[in-house]
Amino acid sequence: MIRYEIKKIFSKTICRISMIVLLLSLIISCYFAITNITYIDEQGVWHTGIAAARDLRTEKQKWEGTLDEEALQKVLDEYRKINEEYPIRQGDYTANMLHDSKVQGISEIKDMINIGFCEFRDFNYYRIDSVSKDEVGKLYENRVKSLEKWLGSEDAEGLFDENEKAFLLERYGQLKAPLYYEDYDGWRSVLHYAQTIVMLVM
């Protein structure tokens, strides 16, 4: 029965063409999902593809683990060491790529620190530069405080009632800390293109 249905599908030229187009679209979507991950080598050269994803994962796995105060301080030390040896120079593309190649292993943790010490709903790429080793351990506590401060500001006025504010603060306070870090670039790329791939398959 199944064999008959398959033969029926491929018996018409229009069906064969449609299947070829569908297959090509699926291959292209999978290709973009794979090449969406980039890795910068020690010479500051960009790479994409499976090998790049593997190399980037290797870099990030060095920092896999619980992000407690000690781990966050190590990230801060590493970032400052990189800044001293490979400083960002305005207009110097090569120097900046070398800097990024050294930072890519800790980039997500660095961004987490930036977000944790910025005002709520704000982001400052260089906020980490002014965070001290004593402060960085208060990352999780600080994100709750920043939400509380924002909810009491004029920016949030009229957006939430008191019950909703209390609910948001409660949910933020329930975050299981410290967080556990591991590389998720592969999953992020798959999820980014998952909708397109599922639509094509269906």
Model feature map: region roles:
Residues 121-201:
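Membrane-proximal, non-transmembrane alpha-helical segments
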Residues 78-143:
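Extracytoplasmic loops/domains of multi-pass membrane proteins
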